[in-house]
């Protein structure tokens, strides 16, 4: 049975047990203020090399300053996670970043991703945000997932996040 709950700090490293594998056939690029879809094939076997080491400390810091971490479980197995940053960003400081949203490969298209996204959106609104900011992996499936939920290209990409992830598609959505 699939259940959900907030994660504990000591469970952050369990995020890396999520099966991030994916076959990608199309990638979006941001060019001249528009999205351009290009055919490119990648077989992603899991988390990129070095990503777990790089991001564990970033996620722990996010947790320690009040970030919201929510996991979906199949019995005891973590199969999906959403992380909402607690620091406000944006020109008007009215956006919260959806720092992470991943669902294990076998559980995609099951509704788990939609549920995690919706819970994060509600949590952002409860915390006083007007919008959620998303730096999305540029794969067609990821970008379309967010577009189906009303996300659109960020009017003004966050300079810090854009510098960290210039290849990502920077999106925002009203909460």
Where are these regions (language model features)?
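Short polar/acidic secondary-structure junctions
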Residues: 87-89, 137, 159
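Conserved GNAT acetyl-CoA-binding A-motif
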Residues: 124-137
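Conserved acetyl-CoA-binding loop-helix of GNAT-fold acetyltransferases
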Residues: 100-103, 109-122, 147-148
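Acetyl-CoA-dependent GNAT
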Residues: 9, 17-94, 99, 104, ...
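Short glycine/proline-centered loop/turn elements that form peptide/ligand docking sites
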Residues: 113, 117, 139-142, 159-165
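Conserved catalytic-core motifs of GNAT/GCN5-like acyltransferases
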Residues: 133, 147, 152-168
